[in-house]
A protein has these predicted regions:
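A short glycine-rich, Lys/Arg-flanked "PGG" loop and its adjoining helix->strand segment in the class I
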Residues: 121-133
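Residues lining the SAM
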Residues: 108-111, 140
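Class I SAM-dependent methyltransferase SAM/SAH-binding core
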Residues: 47-95
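C-terminal lobe and adjacent flexible extensions of AdoMet/dcAdoMet transferase-like proteins
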Residues: 199-238
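Conserved class I S-adenosyl-L-methionine
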Residues: 1-35, 38-44, 49, 53
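A short acidic, Gly/Pro-enriched loop at the edge of an enzyme's catalytic core
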Residues: 96-105
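SAM-dependent methyltransferase
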Residues: 138-197
Length: 238
């Protein structure tokens, strides 16, 4: 059952926020590298914005998968001109095994939804099944190293609320322009590391999120990057 109660069009609009462009998008594409000629799985594709950008940057084929039906419907509406190179599928990622024929996976917030090691491992196994040997997964996720009690970050278009680091406890994002909150779940870093290992990935590392160089020196970002940012990247190799 989906934990997603927010509207697809509202969420798509949030992709215009500065942190989503200059931190989220920049980090994902910088870690992915040149996608020219690559076959890519866009896990948790939402309205397909990164699927289309992957093709624009040279990817030969992209599969976009999302568990929310209205997101996939919106992605298909925006897919004009991309039909031959992007396939959108309505499925939860853990229920969508692959054939080991893709070069890369990008997973935007997908791994913020499991509530346990077992669930996280199922997500990771499904994504691993799409990758060739030597294939790469880039994740962008709620940061499990950031633990606090209260609310923070209202000045970046969202408020993040959490209360301690109990495994499976909710992490709530209230995003400007969205009627309903985004509810993620906290897992310990070691839980994620074990899930990737049990899913068959040969390498895994955490990566601090990156800031687009054209924003360097902009004091707007000082609070975002103080201590542990609210988000973190993951890099795994099969």
């Amino acid at each position: 059952m989906s934990n997603i109660t927010y509207k697809a069009d509202e969420y798509a609009d949030s992709k215009k926020f500065p942190f989503r462009i200059h931190v989220e998008k920049y980090t994902i594409f910088e870690l992915l590298g040149d996608p020219t000629g690559k076959r890519v799985l866009d896990a948790g594709c939402g309205d397909g914005i990164y699927s289309r950008q992957l093709v624009d940057q040279g990817a030969s084929f992209v599969i976009g998968v999302d568990g929310a039906k209205d997101f996939i419907e919106l992605a298909k509406q925006k897919n004009g001109g991309y039909e031959e190179r992007i396939q959108f599928v309505h499925s939860f990622i853990q229920d969508f095994p692959g054939n080991g024929d893709l070069d890369s996976v990008i997973a935007s917030y997908v791994l913020s939804y499991p509530k346990s090691l077992e669930e996280a491992t199922a997500y990771c196994k499904a994504m691993a099944s799409h990758l060739k040997s030597g294939g790469k997964l880039i994740g962008f996720n709620n940061n499990p190293f950031e633990v606090f009690d209260g609310v923070k970050h209202a000045d970046y278009g969202f408020e993040k609320e959490m209360h301690g680091d109990t495994e499976g406890s909710p992490v709530i994002y209230r995003v400007a322009g969205m009627d309903n909150p985004i509810v993620n779940f906290h897992l310990h870093p070691k839980t994620y590391e074990r899930a990737f290992r049990e899913a068959g990935f040969s390498e895994f590392r955490w990566q601090r999120v990156l800031l687009n160089p054209n924003q360097q020196g902009n004091s707007y970002w000082n609070n975002f990057f103080s201590n542990e940012p609210s988000f973190v990247a993951m890099l795994a190799m099969k």
